[in-house]
């Protein structure tokens, strides 16, 4: 393992620890269960899952470090020049599904990828981001989420937040339904336009920003009263989350195609979901406002 890879791995393990500790403290009753695993083809990871807490219905914060002699199709499809190279992939990926429909689901991921071939220069890049999926939108929360994202990006250039915000909006889009998964945030891949140290610093800034982006929203909404109907709507909207993860998500596809651990890969799926045939929200309802106002292409910071 190279010095670069060792530094990234140390950071990711520490990030996993810090996020788990913060989430446990916010929940107040549940604790993460750790499941260490190994991958027969090379590598392994630490899966951490929290379930049936006071605030968190189900969540996972996973670390993985896998390696192999050939890239899986999902990784080499848009980089065909890397076919036949050995690879190492390290990352922390998390999804939090709260009980309360007034608390959004959150997702974050930071990862490092390096592909090597004897006699040739190593090719490396970082990827990641974080995004928010509300069920009952609150403008204050959306602005806060994007403000934290913007501040994390600011030291690396004025164009970084707008570019990766737009990429997030484009990526987390359910093409078969022509609707966004949530209100976005940041998404980026193939980050190597800076030198390694700057690129690594950027990834650390994004990883470290997640708790500051999410926990204030959780604190504001976790005690809000909700009805059975609102809970059912949350489960209905969770269906969109499942559809995206199983059809489009690069991380899910990479994990399954590279022989990753299925239980860890599918940890992101919510515990209870519903699909209703051709269900429509009542005009003028909070449920209708979610798609009409919040799940649209908005510049949250320009408007506030």
From Swiss-Prot:
A divalent metal cation binds at residues 97, 107, 146, 176. It is found in: Cytoplasm. One of its GO terms (molecular function) is coproporphyrinogen oxidase activity. One of its GO terms (biological process) is protoporphyrinogen IX biosynthetic process. HAMAP family: Coprogen_oxidas. The record marks 176 as: Important for dimerization. Keywords: Cytoplasm, Heme biosynthesis, Metal-binding, Oxidoreductase, Porphyrin biosynthesis. Its cofactor is a divalent metal cation. The keyword Transport does not apply. The keyword DNA damage does not apply. The lineage of its organism: Bacteria, Pseudomonadati, Pseudomonadota, Gammaproteobacteria, Pseudomonadales. This is Oxygen-dependent coproporphyrinogen-III oxidase. Its EC number is 1.3.3.3. Involved in the heme biosynthesis. Catalyzes the aerobic oxidative decarboxylation of propionate groups of rings A and B of coproporphyrinogen-III to yield the vinyl groups in protoporphyrinogen-IX. It comes from the Bacteria. Substrate binds at residues 93, 109-111, 259-261. InterPro entries: Coprogen_oxidase_aer, Coprogen_oxidase_aer_sf, Coprogen_oxidase_CS. Pathway: Porphyrin-containing compound metabolism; protoporphyrin-IX biosynthesis; protoporphyrinogen-IX from coproporphyrinogen-III (O2 route): step 1/1. The gene is hemF.
